[in-house]
Amino acid sequence: MDPILEEFERAISGLTYTSPTIDYVSDLTGQPVSSGIDAAYWARHLRNPVRFTDATATLHEKGISTFIEIGPDGVLSGLIRETLDREQDLVAVPMLRRDRPEPHTAVTAAAHAHTHGTPVTWTTLHGQATTIDLPTYAF
């Protein structure tokens, strides 16, 4: 990575960077970030080790127990479960799985999160559905 760092930083230095508007934990530092994200940050991110375990632990310490992996397969979900296995109510699920239909795996991930207390806006996934009244049963 070293040979391209300066060129990379120059290439992205013209972009506009703003402070995060939601809580953000960096896997460059493993700590929350509120400012300082600029071209130099992303160049360091490209070069330095990923501190994924530290970032995950920081999120968990802040009360996060549901993790949804956005990526091509479930590698990091397994790492989260392995790292934070002491937490029984932990959910770590991948949004996508290799060689499986995306709609199915995405809805499965949302369902896992929902059953563990994470609010899910189902109409975003399924669109507006027509509802009908069903007969009641005496059992």
Give the role of each language-model region.
Residues 31-32, 75:
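Short, acidic Gly/Pro/Ser/Thr-rich loop/turn segments
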Residues 11-18, 23-25, 41-139:
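Flexible, low-complexity segments
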Residues 4, 35, 89-90:
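Alpha-helical context
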Residues 27-29:
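Reverse-transcriptase-like RNA-dependent polymerase core
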Residues 33-41:
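Gly-rich Lys/Arg/Thr-decorated short loops/hinges at beta-loop-alpha junctions or inter-strand turns
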Residues 1-6, 82-83:
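Short glycine/threonine-rich loop-to-helix capping motif typified by GTGT followed
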